[in-house]
């Protein structure tokens, strides 16, 4: 969301007056209460979009927020107070869909991502397409082979694994899940 918002803001080229965020249902579910990286605990969809606008560096893609400053965080809080943010379900039926629309005083922009966090499939400025590429959701996007995830196999793995080989991964997951739960 932050990446798409940073792209849309760059495309807009002026102060933001309105933001519409369209997301596929699973993204809404997963992001609505998650901590936004590099924000000191800011949470949710609107926070992710606002910090992308105020401190995001779109050219860094997944690291879009890696250089966020405290000043950027304060500006994003002010932006959320001042600007109308609307969050809606995406018009696309994709498993992964993010569409950001922005309006300024004189311009508008729209950025669409599909399939994954960095797959930009369309950019528009003032209604005109400035970038477009075809996207077709593959049927295997909808399912992952989980046939090995039986209770028996999970218990067997847990009882036999060398904990030192998985400690870092498990501790990281505990940290992430704790942040989400808080």
Where are the regions that the model predicts?
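Alpha-helical support elements that line or immediately flank enzyme active sites
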Residues: 1-14
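A structural-propensity feature for long, helix-poor, extended segments
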Residues: 18-58, 77-83
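C-terminal domain-closing interface element
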Residues: 42-62, 91-109
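Residue-level recognition of the N-termini of beta-strands and the immediately preceding loop/turn
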Residues: 16-19, 96-98
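Charged/polar positions on well-ordered alpha helices
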Residues: 7-10, 51, 179
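Glycine-rich, flexible loop motifs
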Residues: 60-84, 164, 178
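Conserved active-site and cofactor/substrate-binding residues in soluble primary-metabolism enzymes
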Residues: 1-3, 40-44, 48, 67-74, ...
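Signature of multi-pass transmembrane helix bundles
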Residues: 80-182
């Amino acid at each position: 969301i932050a990446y798409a918002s940073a792209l849309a803001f760059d495309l807009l080229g002026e102060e933001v007056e309105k933001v519409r965020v369209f997301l596929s249902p699973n993204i809404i579910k997963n992001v609505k209460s998650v901590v936004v990286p590099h924000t000191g605990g800011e949470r949710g969809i609107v926070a992710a979009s606002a910090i992308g606008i105020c401190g995001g560096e779109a050219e860094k893609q997944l690291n879009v927020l890696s250089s966020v400053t405290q000043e950027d965080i304060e500006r994003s809080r002010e932006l959320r107070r001042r600007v109308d943010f609307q969050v809606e379900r995406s018009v696309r039926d994709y498993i992964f869909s993010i569409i950001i629309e922005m309006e300024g005083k004189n311009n508008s922009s729209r950025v669409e991502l599909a399939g994954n966090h960095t797959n930009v499939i369309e950019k528009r400025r003032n209604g005109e397409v400035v970038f477009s590429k075809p996207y077709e959701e593959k049927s295997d996007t909808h399912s992952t082979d989980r046939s090995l995830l039986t209770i028996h196999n999970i218990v067997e793995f847990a009882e036999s694994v060398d904990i030192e080989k998985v400690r870092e991964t498990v501790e990281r997951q505990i940290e992430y899940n704790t942040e989400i739960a808080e």
